[in-house]
Every structure is written in structure tokens, then in C-alpha cells.
Amino acid sequence: MKIYGIYMDRPLSQEETDRLMSFVSAEKREKCRRFYHKEDAHRTLLGDVLVRSVISEQYQLNKADIRFSAQEYGKPCIPDLPNAHFNISHSGHWVIGAFDSDPIGVDIEKMKPISLGIAERFFSKNEYSDLLSKHKDEQNDYFYHLWSMKESFIKQEGKGLSLPLDSFSVRLHEDGRVSVELPEHHTPCFIKTYEVDPGYKMAVCAARPDFPEDITMISYEALL
């Protein structure tokens, strides 16, 4: 299992953008051009090329030759490499990629003030109760802690919106353990959180608990 992070400390230059665009599909190039905000295009582009870079090094392929598809519920995959599982998440200044030989999910969220009504709407009753039990000053932080863990689980499952957020509970125990409560869910899954930035929450969900201790940082230059 490998987890990589790109910190976008500056916008991509036009030269860097053109170089990265040369690796991706025509459909992805068009998608990037349609974004209103350049930052959204840059995050999407960096995520795509991050996957290509990691997979190309692992399997000795050219980055531009890798072809992506989507599973039944829309999770990206590489049909020619069924054991090359990956997942991408981006928010704010961060692009994160997680890679493993089994299904994996990752989520990073830039924190901002939230309404408890959002938690009541999307969280399970147990999660909402856990949130309300926190001191008011801790609730925003705990909300994003839960949200990132729940999203990482949904992305690891690969079922998208067919698995509602309130259909399962993620519980963070006092000893640091994380458990997922979902009726009739028998597939092993493990969740680890990472503190990559004070203003963000990040979580990875995998089929095995052998998570790396830290993420590996990747520069723009390493992708070119």
C-alpha cells in the first residue's frame, strides 16, 4: 500500500499544464478545459497524472498508454490491470492518491464552518449522537473527522451514491480504533486517519491494516 500527496503551493505554469495534458486522454483534456476555475482543472489534472506516474513505474508502462474505465457505480479502474487498485481525492491545496492490490478509498476535506443540520441529515443516529457529545469547540473538527472516514469507506466499497451516508456508522473509539457498523457487511475493512495539514482531515480505508506511517510527498516536477 502506498499513499502519495501533492501540495499545490502555487498554480501550474502553462508549460507544466501543457506537459501534463499530453499524458491524459482527450476526454480528460476536454474536462479540464471546461472548468471555470483553473484550480479545479489543476487538481483534476494532477490527480490523473499521479495515478499514471505511480502505475507506469510499478508496471513499466508509458504514462500516456494507460487507459482508464469505470466500474459499475463509477469508481475509476484500469481494466488491463485488475489488481492495480487506486483512489484519488483532492480538496483545497491537496491532491492525494492511494494505491494497493485490493480496493482502497481515500478522502481529504478542507475544513470550514458547518451547520449541525448537515450532520443530522447525512450522519447515522449513532454518529450524530457522538458528534453532539463533543464540546462545541470540538464539533467542527469531529464532523470532518467522521466525514472523511465515511467518504473513504464509501470510495473503498466502490458503490458511490447507492450507499447512503446514513446507512452505516463509523465510530471512533477512545483507544484510537475505528469501526464500521453496517448490517450484513462482512468484507474486512480498516480505516486510518492522517494529519497532513491543520486545516484538513484525511482518511484511508483499505482491506488490510498495513498502512504506511506517513504519506509520500510528490512534487510537480516528478510528474512531468
Curated annotation (Swiss-Prot):
Keywords: Antibiotic biosynthesis, Magnesium, Metal-binding, Transferase. Residues 158-189 are annotated as: Peptidyl carrier protein binding. It is an enzyme of class 2 (transferase). It comes from the Bacteria. InterPro entries: 4-PPantetheinyl_Trfase_dom, 4-PPantetheinyl_Trfase_dom_sf, AASDHPPT_N, P-Pant_transferase_sf, Ppantetheine-prot_Trfase_dom. One of its GO terms (cellular component) is cytosol. GO terms for biological process: antibiotic biosynthetic process; fatty acid biosynthetic process; lysine biosynthetic process via aminoadipic acid. GO terms for molecular function: holo-[acyl-carrier-protein] synthase activity; magnesium ion binding. Its cofactor is Mg(2+). Its EC number is 2.7.8.-. It catalyses: apo-[peptidyl-carrier protein] + CoA = holo-[peptidyl-carrier protein] + adenosine 3',5'-bisphosphate + H(+). Mg(2+) binds at residues 107, 109, 151. Belongs to the P-Pant transferase superfamily. Gsp/Sfp/HetI/AcpT family. PANTHER family: L-AMINOADIPATE-SEMIALDEHYDE DEHYDROGENASE-PHOSPHOPANTETHEINYL TRANSFERASE, PHOSPHOPANTETHEINE TRANSFERASE. May activate the peptidyl carrier protein (PCP) domains of fengycin synthase by transferring the 4'-phosphopantetheinyl moiety of coenzyme A (CoA) to a serine residue. This is 4'-phosphopantetheinyl transferase ffp. The gene is ffp.
